A protein has these predicted regions:
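Glycine-rich, proline-tolerant flexible connector loops at the mouths of alpha/beta enzymes
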Residues: 29-52, 102-110, 201
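Active-site acidic/histidine proton-transfer and metal-coordination neighborhood
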Residues: 11-14, 50-56, 69-162
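Conserved beta-strand positions in the central sheet of alpha/beta enzyme cores
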Residues: 29, 59-60, 99, 137, ...
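Catalytic-core regions built around general acid/base machinery
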Residues: 42-55, 120-128, 179-183, 215-220
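Histidine-acidic metal/acid-base catalytic patches
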Residues: 1-2, 9-24, 55, 145-165, ...
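Short, conserved active-site loops that position catalytic residues or coordinate cofactors/metal ions
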Residues: 23-33, 59-66, 101-102
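Short, solvent-exposed loop/turn segments at secondary-structure boundaries
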Residues: 39-42, 70-75, 109-114, 175-176, ...
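Short, small-residue-enriched loops and turns at beta-alpha junctions
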Residues: 36-38, 65-68, 105-107, 142-145, ...
Length: 245
């Protein structure tokens, strides 16, 4: 099992790489987001060199608020393109998976339509990712995609997709962790850990909230999970992240 951490997109990627390498993490969960880490604003050569110098592995992560379920085709296509233009770089830095985030859509659109539009978007992205030997991974999100049924529709409609289990999301407003793990254990390739009080996605240090981490870890061990776990702990004080490791 490998333990990693995610860069804060408000900071330069190099700062995260230095901290994670010095703190004994195995990889960076590299999110390419604004304001300082989007593919359009980073110095790709410098980031590539810094990753190589750090010795860290890379897991790919994309902007979490892209409108993949927009009923407006041009907006949906822009969201798709925003992910596609990251794929070559993710391949170059050694990533094998790239996380995308399903969009619950807008209230005037039926949930089943939002699910279908996400599936359409992810099929296009997945096909492009395959050209770079990358696997697209879908993360459970607050909203309609906190539930098994819509996620299952995505993963069966686009068979190449794999599952990313965010534990912090899974316990919000009704604990669905066991349900999600049981349903998607065969497709599970990536996990996020962060603590909360089960009301908001707080991204607290492990042990600071209400999540039963003994139960979580035992359940993952019980299915033989041995891949990547990212500590998605957000704080201005990096000691909280390091203490969670």
């Amino acid at each position: 099992m490998k333990i990693g951490a995610m860069n804060n997109p408000r900071l330069e990627i190099g700062e995260a790489l230095a901290l994670f390498a010095a703190s004994g993490f195995d990889y960076i969960d590299l999110t390419l987001e604004y304001p300082k880490a989007h593919i359009d604003v980073i110095d790709k050569k410098a980031v590539l060199a810094a990753i190589k110098a750090s010795g860290l592995g890379v897991v790919g992560h994309t902007t979490y608020y892209l409108p993949f379920a927009s009923p407006i085709n041009s907006i949906r296509q822009a969201a798709i393109e925003d992910v596609i233009k990251t794929l070559g770089f993710f391949k170059e830095v050694g990533a094998r998976t790239v996380t995308v985030h399903p969009d619950s859509g807008v209230g005037t659109i039926e949930p089943k339509t939002s699910v279908s539009l996400n599936a359409l978007s992810f099929k296009i992205i997945s096909d492009e990712a395959a050209k770079h030997d990358l696997t697209v991974v879908v993360e459970n999100m607050p909203g309609i995609f906190s539930n098994v049924e819509p996620l299952n529709t995505l993963l069966t409609t686009v068979p190449a997709l794999r599952f990313h289990l965010d534990v912090g999301h899974a316990v919000l407003r009704g604990n669905k962790f066991k349900q999600l793990l049981g349903m998607f254990k065969e497709k599970l390739v990536h996990v996020h850990f962060s603590d909360n009080r089960t009301r908001e996605d707080d991204h607290m240090p492990i042990g600071a909230g209400n999540i039963n981490w003994t139960e979580i870890v035992q359940a993952l061990k019980g299915i033989g999970y041995d891949a990547t776990i990212t500590l998605e702990v957000f704080s201005n004080d990096p000691r909280y992240l390091v203490a969670s490791r």
